[in-house]
Regions:
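Metal-dependent enolase-superfamily TIM-barrel catalytic cores that perform enediolate-based chemistry
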Residues: 80-187
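Conserved, mostly hydrophobic/aromatic
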Residues: 2, 62, 75, 143, ...
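Catalytic alpha/beta core domains of metabolic enzymes, predominantly
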Residues: 175-267
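Metal- or metallocofactor-binding catalytic centers and their adjacent structured scaffolds
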Residues: 4-73
Length: 312
């Protein structure tokens, strides 16, 4: 039996790329995908990028699988292929989604963690953060999901700093570059781009508007472009975070192997699933523990046919 590589792309309704579309595109292009003379992942990604120009999610899954297989063929862990030092890896945050304040506090208490990512964008964002801060000394990060206007951001961010918030993610609408330039100059906290930085060409636009970027493998189309985005961000003096879209252990393992090269990570997807489809990474109070297997280090458990539910 040959070497197998595994990849993942979640189906997110908001982006209108359901599982059915990914399967249909795979079936339609199957011969081209399988017959490519694979030598290394970067060349394969460029081929896929042109073969499937309207399906970044599917390209991401195939790209991750290519890197997994490539490292397995070398009998190395993927981070070793890139000469990554995992000793100083960032720890992952744990996300508290928007809910009633009482429920958000309850979720925090249920999951003791060193870093929390707090979703905001409500009429009482400061009330939320105050209540959470009263119940933990952990690091707090705030994700506004493009939910504020400039005046609101200018008003709230100084108060968030007083509450010990570390940084703010995507405070304004993704296309409000004029507002972000003003906020960048005025904000007492670092600002990280999420919706405003999806593709490689977006990175340079973030300079002088954000202090860092949040890369999503699924959105940018895989590990290959993500590595180039990291390099570009470093050259521009931007911080780098990698986020998740509720991937299982398969997609999260891809993020895990990039940890030596980034500053922050949000990869709590497997913690939010009732059922996973693989094993291979563990969480020790935010610290990522790798398996001893090559490639992504995962073992596929064959549960893909079951319904995977996300906890509310």
């Amino acid at each position: 039996m040959g070497v197998k590589g595994y990849g993942e792309a979640p189906a997110i309704a908001y982006y209108n790329i359901p599982v059915e579309k990914m399967i249909a595109d795979l079936e339609q292009k199957k011969n081209f995908i399988e017959k490519f003379a694979f030598t290394e992942p970067e060349r394969y990604w460029h081929y896929l990028h042109h073969l499937l120009p309207q399906n970044n999610f599917l390209v991401c899954a195939l790209d991750i699988a290519a890197w997994d297989m490539y490292a397995k063929l070398k009998q190395q862990k993927l981070y070793d292929v890139w000469k990554g030092n995992v000793q100083q890896n960032p720890v992952t945050d744990y996300t508290i989604g928007i809910d009633s304040i009482d429920n958000m506090v309850a979720k925090l208490k249920e999951k003791p963690w060193p870093i929390y990512k707090i979703k905001v964008g409500t009429p009482d964002d400061i009330g939320i953060v105050k209540a959470l801060r009263a119940n933990t000394d952990a690091v707090l990060r705030v994700d506004a999901n493009a939910g504020w206007d400039l005046d609101t951001a200018l008003k709230l961010i100084p108060q968030l700093k007083e509450l010990g918030v570390e940084f703010v993610e995507q405070p304004l609408a993704k296309d409000n570059w004029e507002g972000m330039k003003i906020l960048f100059q005025e904000s007492p906290l670092p600002l990280y781009a999420d919706e405003a930085c999806v593709y490689e060409q977006d990175v340079v636009k973030c300079k002088d508007h954000f202090h860092g970027i949040n890369i999503k493998l699924t959105k940018c189309s895989g590990i290959t472009p993500a590595r180039r985005m990291i390099k570009q961000a470093r050259e521009l003096g931007l911080g780098v975070m990698i986020g998740c879209m509720n991937e299982s252990t398969v997609g999260s393992a891809a993020v895990a192997h990039l940890l030596p090269f980034i500053d922050h990570v949000d990869m709590d997807g497997p913690l939010l699933l009732e059922e996973d489809v693989a094993t291979g990474i563990d969480f020790d109070y935010g610290k990522i523990i790798y398996s001893n297997k090559p490639g992504l280090g995962i073992e596929y458990t064959g549960l893909y046919h079951k319904e995977i539910k996300t906890k509310s």
